[in-house]
Amino acid sequence: DIIQFLGASKKFEGLKRPILDNQDLEISKGDRIGIVGGNGQGKTTLLKLITGDEVIDSGSRDLAPGAIIGYYHQDHRTLDFKLNAVKQVELLRPDMSYGEIRAALGRFQFAKEQVDTPLGKLSGGERARIALLKILLEENNLLLLDEPTNHLDMDAKETLEEALTEYEGAIVTVSHDRWFLDQIVNQIWELQDGIVTKYYGNYTDYIR
C-alpha cells in the first residue's frame, strides 16, 4: 500500500455529520479512484487527509516509505503567475532541455506565443493545463486531482486522459465529469455521512 488509514475519523466543529467515521482505507499502486458524493460531504477534505494537510481526529494514517504525493488544487496555488510556462517547468525540472520543455508544453496545447506569456495573462484553462503538466512531471507516485477537468476543453481533457493513462502511480480524483471518470478510474469511492462505500469499475459501472 502507498497509504493506509485504519479506524480514521474526522469531524469539523459546527457540522452535523463527520467527514470520516471510523473508516479503513488503503491506496495501492495501480489504484485509480474516483471520489463521488454530494456537496458538503467532504470530498476535498478527504484529499487533504491523504496529503496530511488536514489531520484525522482518531485512528491511524500510514504513508509508505518512498511515497511522494502530487496534488492538483483547483486554485492553481502551485503556479507563480509572474513567470511564463517555460520558466515554470525549468524551475521544476532543470534536467530537461529547452526542446524537451517545449515538446511537453506542445503536448498540452501550448502554442509558440503562449509559452513566453506570464501566467497571470493566460486564461483559466491555460493555467490549469500548466498546473497539470507540472504535477505529471514531478517525481511522485500518488496523484491527487481536485476537479482537474474544470476549465479544460475536450482536446485538453483528452490530452490529460492520455497522460494519466501512461502514469504508473496511483491516482485519486474528485470529479463531477462522468466522461473523465469513465476513462480514468477503476474504483469509485462514494462518500456519504462519513462512510466510504467502494465500488469496483468506472463511473458507468457505479451508476448501474
Give a label for each model feature.
Residues 1-208:
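ABC ATP-binding cassette signature C-motif
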